[in-house]
Amino acid sequence: MATIIKNGKRWHAQVRKFGVSKSAIFLTQADAKKWAEMLEKQLESGKYNEIPDITLDELIDKYLKEVTVTKRGKREERIRLLRLSRTPLAAISLQEIGKAHFREWRNQRLKEVSPTTVLRERSSLSALMAKTIEWDFITENPLKYLEKPKAPAPRTRRYNEHEIERLIFVSGYDVEHIEPPKTLQNCTGAAFLFAIETAMRAGEIASLTWNNINFEKRTTFLPITKNGHSRTVPLSVKAIEILQHLTSVKTESDPRVFQMEARQLDHNFRKLKKMEGLENANLHFHDTRRERLAEKVDVMVLAKISGHRDLSILQNTYYAPDMAEGYKTKAGYDLTPTKGLSQRNFFFFNENFIVFTTNPPIVIKL
């Protein structure tokens, strides 16, 4: 029989059954009752597994050492989880932690940071708790029924020509391609222009190697991307010119085209913005992905170029249907959309097929 008693602002629950005596403290009476009922059912069915008496902080440490280190996005996840380990939530025992604790954490974080940041941290926490279930420490993810913060509207900020010119000027990159880039600052300017021409992510640009560039076909192959899939990106005339300019500083010791890590690219770009007085202009390097390609390329083709798996994100955030003059572009592409089809016909999309809900359905193999 469970005993639930209020002690100050908290609720103390105790279960004694079949020789097992367990207790825990909760923020709400409802959470205390739920825990007690779940424990009693487990004891009655013989499925009871004792939850180890470790704190969330200790659990985070185990997860970082065994799981995070195996991920491609380990740096970002490590930063988020270490930040969580410094919150009051981290000191709570796994035997006691419940939805109310996570709700209190969520509400407090929303006072400190943006909903987007909270969503990312919540995602890392949820992955941590899911792994905890796999380790047989708990049987249910306490975040499962916790309401997510409402995501903000997609970013639509785009660079204007004046901002592009200012950033290139302060980088010292020679757009006339006479003087080769000599510093990381110069290379950052080149990477910025290359991003505008290709819609590639900063990490993809930083990891781009010479052996994956085909000058004859005017393409570059990305063996691994953010979503875990490879893709081939067509290169515009300007993108090819930038790459040809960078061949003058190509070295045998470093196969990377821009010779810097993603962190260096991010740091140097922030430095350029500060030098030019644009640090408060609400501009991110990632905003280059909605620049010229969004103006010139059909949304279906753009999805294949940019690597987006979700067409709704692409259309809401990046796509600008300003294509009245056709698809023969200054960038060097000749991309004519399939006649008779539109985004309204869209039904399903992945890296292999586009299926349209016409009658009869049309399947296009990519």
Curated annotation (Swiss-Prot):
Q: Which CDD domains match?
A: INT_Rci_Hp1_C
The biological processes this protein is annotated with in GO are: chromosome segregation; DNA recombination; establishment of integrated proviral latency; symbiont entry into host cell; viral genome integration into host DNA
Q: Does the entry feature the keyword DNA-binding, yes or no?
A: yes
* MF GO annotations: DNA binding; site-specific recombinase activity
InterPro entries documented for this protein: CB, DNA_brk_join_enz, Integrase-like_cat_sf, Integrase_catalytic, Integrase_recombinase_N, Tyrosine_recombinase_XerCD
**Superkingdom assignment:** Bacteria
Active-site annotation? R201, K226, H308, Y318 (o-(3'-phospho-dna)-tyrosine intermediate)
Q: What are the residue boundaries of the Core-binding (CB) domain, all occurrences included?
A: 54-133
UniProt domain Tyr recombinase: residue ranges: 168-331
Sorted alphabetically, the keyword list is: DNA integration, DNA recombination, DNA-binding, Viral genome integration, Virus entry into host cell
Q: Supply the Pfam families for this chain.
A: Phage_integrase
- Family stated for the protein in its record: Belongs to the 'phage' integrase family.
| Stated name of the protein | Putative integrase/recombinase HI_1572
Give start-end of the signal peptide: none
